[in-house]
Amino acid sequence: MFPEPAPPKSGDARPKSGGTWLTLVELAAMVGGRAEGDLDKHIAGVMSLAQAGPSDLGLLVDSRYSRAAGETAAGAILVSPNLEDMLDPAQSRVVVEDPRKTLPTVLEYFFSDPLPRPGLHETAIIAEDVKLGTGVSVGPYVVIEDNVVMGEGTTLHAHVVVRSGARLGRDVTLHPHVVVYPHVRLGDRVVLHAGVRVGVDGFGYAHSEGSLARIPHVGACIIGDDVEIGANSCVDRGSIGHTELGAHVKLDNLVHIGHNVTVGPRTVMAAQ
């Protein structure tokens, strides 16, 4: 198996991503919880109870997993007050009212990706009339066509294509091989994972003299603030009128949103 991270030495620096660690007391303070047990224990990551090692934080959110909590090698366990009595008294722990709500804060600390450096990669192809906000990061082999507007802090990873007339808000993240079709509008803090296509023509044909004539799709694809779309998903543009995803919508991988669909705010869809 993989070796456990070496415990830190006095004065060790703590990089924001990779090799991070916290003492149990520091971890409890970060999440507004109570530390019990070995208060100087160093925690360097989060893992399931079954797979955790001495430097990992485990998670107990349901009494069904009390046996796993008793057998775990985790250095400490994140637990709620009503489940705390299920732990061995010697088990180090961080006690919080709602471990599920606390978990994102812990995961972001230990596993957050390093921020990309602002700048334009030398292999990127960018039209002359593109308007880029401050702090934009454009990766290798990105293509940005004419009349595109991108807000500040936006990141385009390798091989992204942004077609003409698209509008991207602030702090948008497009992962590798995303394609944004013409005249798409992305709100602020939108995240599109690898292989996503937005603004694609919908599936529309008309019978004409024994053949099928393609119906042009001329509507927009409008995606609200804080939307996240999973890998290899597609969102079609409207035929006449728009396709719209409201703010805070979350789509799983391999989801297809057809033309002229309206998805309300805070909707969550799992893959089919």
Segments predicted by a language model, with ranges:
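Terminal amphipathic alpha-helical/low-complexity segments used for targeting or macromolecular assembly
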Residues: 1-123, 184, 189, 195-196, ...
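Structural signal for interior beta-strand "rungs" in well-ordered beta-sheet cores
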Residues: 59, 119-271
